[in-house]
Every structure is written in structure tokens, then in C-alpha cells.
Amino acid sequence: DRGNMAAAYRKVDTIIPRPDQLGIPEAVVQLYKKKRGLVLVTGPTGSGKSTTLASIINKANENLTDHIITLEDPIEYIHKHKKSVVNQREVGMDTLSYANALRAALREDPDIILVGEMRDLETISTAITAAETGHLVFSTLHTIGAASTIDRIIDVFPTHQQQQTRIQLAMILEGVISQALIPTADGNGRVAAFEVMLASPAIRSLIREQKNHQIQSTIQTSRAQGMITLDDYILDLYKSGRITRDMALVYAQDQVAMKKQM
């Protein structure tokens, strides 16, 4: 800063945590078994998206005989070959950009592709194409909530392409997982809260028909299918004593409704 060297550090454990250690819902973990499609993990910077994805990729590595390619900036967790073969590439070191790396990856017959972040139109468009052509693609966005995530993707495209993109998303999207890390009640760390949207026929229909405003209520009524809203998850954490009332309200999407349910 101002002529002096500066650095930003993030502590990353070298051991990849298991999904149950992170509290990742089982319905989310099982998405690694999909043969094709797009799975998005969303949330603000520092919400644990990379760790969640590393844990799911590790689960796939342990259980599938697949070819997995990860494109990251930077590489945070090292995946060793287990049942699968895992190739990891770092933007800036091994490739110029996510879009370049993704195009190259498609020529290598991968089963699963992790794209560290969908930053621009070219990367998003190529990721959608990859999911359409028989690959399972995992990626992240800095959005909160399924509806805003879908809107964000569609808004990146020129107006004349948006309806076609909406139809493509309705076909290929398998899940949107939004997460936040909330300080625990005992002050000894943070606990993850998740919103889970899975691509049921009802959800696919809402995306296709441009009724994103109805997605939240559909998630609320689909808990038996493994879906849950972020606020319902936060409320469960509060009721189980994992987080304080104040923290529940700070992270709630709808504070008025949260207070009533408390």
C-alpha cells in the first residue's frame, strides 16, 4: 500500500474436511452422483464455498472412477488420485483465464469439472455448454439465494439470448446451494448455514416460465425433497442452541418473519 508491499492471507487446512464435518446436507452431497448438469455454490467472499466444493469433489474422488478437472484461482486444496484421476489447474499459472481453461478441459473427456468462479459471460456460457454436453459442472457465484443466482446468470447475457439461456438453465441446473458462516453461540468458531434448491420438475418449470419470484416459496414447501431456505436453516440452528438470537437475526434474509418464528 502506498509504495509498500502488502499481502492477504487465508488459513486453509491441508486436510480436506468430510461433508459431515462441515454440516453439508446429504441431498447436496449426493449431487456428485449426477452424470451431467450444473451445480452452483453461492455466497459472499469468505462463506466457505471453496471448502464445500473441495469436500464434495473429494467425495466423488473416493467413490467414482471418473476423470475430474478442477480450474481454480488459486488452488486451495490438493486432491490426490483416489478412485478418480484429478487434474488441477491454476489460473495465472497453468492457464490465462477460466474461460480458456474450460475450453481446453472439454477436449480432455472429463466427467466432472470444477470451475472456481463464473466471473464473466464467456465462462458462464462455456460452463452451460459443458453441462449440456454431458459433463457435471460445479462452480460458484457471489450471490445469495437461488432466485438471485438464476437472475444473475441470465442478466449476464445480451437481451436477445436471455430466453434461450433461461430454457437451457431449466434443463441443466441440478442445484443451487447458498451458504453463510455464522459465529457459534459458544464463541469457538463458526457454523455453516445452507439454502438448498434442487431442480425438481416444479423448479425447472418456474425457471423456464420466468417465475423466479415463486422459487423461494417452492423451496419452503419442498423440505421433504431435501430443499430448505436459508432462513429456515438459520432458525433450526438457533432452536438447537448452535447460534444466538442476535446472530440469527443478523444473517436472516427476512428479519421480521424470523422474529415471529422465534
Predicted regions and their residues:
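Short, flexible helix-loop junctions that flank or precede catalytic/ligand sites
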Residues: 1-262
